[in-house]
């Protein structure tokens, strides 16, 4: 079942993906890496080529693809753009499974992307083995990608306050 695989994505990525194409690369029967693209980029020209290149570089045996989109999950058949993205991925690497997920959180639902009829509930991401491992390692799990971006954004007021202290410290003040 894909429920536990989808449920582990926030722990591996650091945030729950939305409007995303996620590729879970497998090597020797284990997850070797997880890659994510904004769905808009993945469905655009050459979008999945980035994923294929990275997956091939890691010499993965196969990949599980997850399209995370409430809109796509409502469609019984993937849109042409999403199908093209999945086809592009499968043209470059062996796709062992593809699912469409409405949301990666408790209560979310997944179904196979090829109409096979398989579907199920997303396992609670907060209680996954991967989430426990992430917390044990001291990694923070963010509520969204925007929270991750905000955590590394430059604080203009703080930079302005520290800049005078950096004069003569050996580095460009503008990079504070």
Regions found by a protein language model. Name each.
Residues 3, 7-12, 18, 37-176:
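Charged, compositionally biased boundary regions
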């Amino acid at each position: 079942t894909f429920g536990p695989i989808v449920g582990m994505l926030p722990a591996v990525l650091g945030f729950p993906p939305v409007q995303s194409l996620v590729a879970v690369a497998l090597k020797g029967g284990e997850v070797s890496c997880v890659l994510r693209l904004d769905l808009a980029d993945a469905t655009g020209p050459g979008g999945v080529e980035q994923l294929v290149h990275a997956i091939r570089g890691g010499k993965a045996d196969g990949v599980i693809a997850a399209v995370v989109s409430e809109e796509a999950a409502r469609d019984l058949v993937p849109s042409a753009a999403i199908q093209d993205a999945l086809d592009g991925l499968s043209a470059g690497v062996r796709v062992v499974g593809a699912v469409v997920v409405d949301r990666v959180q408790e209560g979310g639902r997944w179904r196979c992307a090829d109409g096979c009829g398989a579907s199920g509930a997303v396992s609670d991401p907060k209680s996954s083995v991967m989430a426990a491992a992430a917390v044990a390692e001291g990694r923070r799990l963010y509520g969204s990608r925007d929270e991750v971006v905000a955590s590394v954004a430059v604080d203009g007021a703080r930079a302005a306050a520290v800049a005078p202290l950096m004069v003569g410290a050996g580095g460009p003040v503008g990079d504070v």
